[in-house]
Amino acid sequence: MNRRSFMAQAAGVALTAHEALLPAPARAGVQALDRVAGAVSQPGPGVGPDVSRYRLTRDRVLNGTGPAYTRDFLLADVRAIPERRFTNFSGDLSGRWIGALSASSRSFGEQFPMLQDVVNSTIALQHEDGYFGGKFHYDQPNDDDLALLWGNGRLLVGLMEYCALNPDPAVLGAAIKLGDFLLRIAPRFNSQAMADAFSADHYASSYICWTQQTEGLAALYAATRDERYRKLCAEISKRISRRPGDHVHGYLTSLRGALDLHDVTGDAAYLNQVTAAWQDVVHSGDLLITGGVPERWSPKRERTEGCAECDWLRLNLGLYRATADAKYLDIAQETYFNEFSMNQFASGDFGHGKLNTAGLTETVMVRAWWCCTLHGLRTFADLNNAAFRVMKNEVFFDFPIDSRVSSQGFAAEAKSDLARNGEVRIDVHAAGKGQRLSVFKPAWADRVTLRRNGTAVSGLSLEGIAAGDVVVVQYDMSLHAKEFGAAARRLHFGPWLLGISSGANPTYSGELQAQNLFDLSTFRAIPGRALSVFQVPAAAGQMRYKSAEFPDQPAEVELVAVAEQTANPPETWQLVVPVDPAAG
C-alpha cells in the first residue's frame, strides 16, 4: 500500500513526505508503518519539510513505542485503571487521541481504521451520570475530581471532532450526555468559591480544569443548537482569568473555546474578550523569543510545554481567521517556525523544554507522550487548513508551508522550499471564473515577489487565476539582530530564530560561555551545507567571537535555526549572543 501521499477532501489539505530525507528514526517509522494497517493514505504528489513534520508525529502516534498507543493503553483513563501515568485525568489521553486522528482525517484525507473501534469502546464506558472515569465526588470535590473534569473536557472535544468527521448519532448522544453532566454540576463549579478553592497552586488540577470546558461546549452547541450549552459556555467564559503561576495550556484552551463561541454565534463580545486577553499575554513578559509561551505563568516560569505552544499557535490562527489582522498571523508563523518546531522531537513526540531565569530555552528533553504529542498532532490540521483561505472569488495564500486546498471551485497545492532558497511553488489545479490569488507578505520577509508561469508579475495579487497556472512565490530574507537587554542580541534569518547548539558546536560549551563576545559583522552563510528535511540551510551561518576563557585565540561558532532540533537528539542551546563592543 502506497503511504507516500495524501488525497485532499473538500476544505481540506493533502500533503506527502519524502522518506529519503527523513532522519533514521523517522524513516524507520515510515517504513514500519507500511507494514501495518494503521493508516490508509491515498495517492497524490507533494514533498516538503512541513508535511514531513506531520508524518513524523502521525507515525509516532500510530506505530511508535515508548509507549505505544494501543487500544487498552488509551482506554485506561476512562476505565480508571492505574496502569500508566495520569489515568486520574479521565479521558485526557483517549480524548486527545480521538480528536487528533479525527481532525487529521478531515484535513489530510486519511483513514485510520482503529479510530472507530476506540471511539465505540470509549462511549461504552460512560457512566449513567454522563461522565467518564473514576468516581466523581459531587459534594466535596478534590483535586482528582478536577483532574477528571479536565480529562472529560478533552474527551468531549475529541468526541465532537469525531462527529465532525463522522456524524454518528451514538457518539453525539454520548457527547450530549456528558454536556448534561456539566450542566448538572455548573451551579457549584461556575462560582468564585470554586475558583478560589482550586487556585493556581493546584496547577494541572486548578480551576482551569473547569474553564477549559468552553471548547467542548462551543462545539456541542454548534452541533445541537441547544441553548443550554451556549449559555453555559458563555457563563464559563466570564470565569476565564490569567492567574500568576497558573497552567498556560488550560488558560489558552479556555480562550480558544471562547473564540469558538464567537465563531458559532457571531457575538463580538467573545472576540473582544479574547483579543484583550491576547494583548495581556503579549505584554505580560511571558512571551518567549521563540514565539512560544511557558508551561506556567510567572513567577512559575521554568519550562515550556508543547500543549501550550500548540494552543498559542492555534489561538493566533483563530484570531487571524476572525479578524484578518496580520499581527496574529505574524505571531502564528513565528511560533510555528521556532517554538513549535524546536519542541518536536526526532521521535515525533512533543514535550518540555527547560527555561533559564531569563526565559530562554536551554534544552528540550522531556517527551510528554501523555498530552503534548497528541496535541502536537492535532495542531498540524489547523496549520494545513490555514495555509489557503478561499473567500468566494478571492483566494489568499497566507502561510508558506506545504499544503493543499480544494474548496469553492478552487484547488491548488503548495510545495515549500523556503528553508533552502526562499521559494514556495503553487500549482493551481482548478479555479473558478474571475478568481484572484493574493499572497500575504509576512513581517519577517524583506520582500515578496511572484512569478506566474515563469514570468515576473508586479504586486502580490494575480487576477484570473486558471487551472494549470504555476505560481512561484519568492520570499527574500536576511539576517536581523534584535536587542535582548542592553548588551546582547537575538539573531533571526527570515522567520527562523538562530542559536548555538551543542551538536553543531561540540567544543563551544564552557563555564564562561555566557560571557563570550560576538562580532555580528563577521556572520557569513555556510555554503554547501548538507540538506536534510528538518535543516534550514538558508539560515545557517558562522560567526567569530572572543572567548571569555581564551580571548587571545580566534574562535568561530556555527549558528543554525532552532527548528533543526527535530533532526537531532536533545541538545543544549544558547539563544542570544553578547555583542563585542570593540567590534563596532
What residue ranges belong to the model's regions?
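A surface-exposed beta-strand-loop module
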Residues: T449-V470, D476-G485
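Aromatic (Trp/Tyr) and acidic
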Residues: G29-P113, N142-N166, Y207-R228, L232, ...
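C-terminal beta-rich recognition modules with glycine/proline-rich loops and embedded aromatic residues
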Residues: S52, C233, V274, L329-R420, ...
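N-terminal export signals
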Residues: S5-R27
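Asp-box/WD-like beta-propeller blade repeats and closely related beta-sheet repeat scaffolds
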Residues: D139-L146, L172, L178-A204
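Helix-terminus loop motifs that line ligand-binding clefts
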Residues: W97, E110-D143, G173, G285-V293, ...
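Solenoid-like repeat scaffolds
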Residues: S241-P244
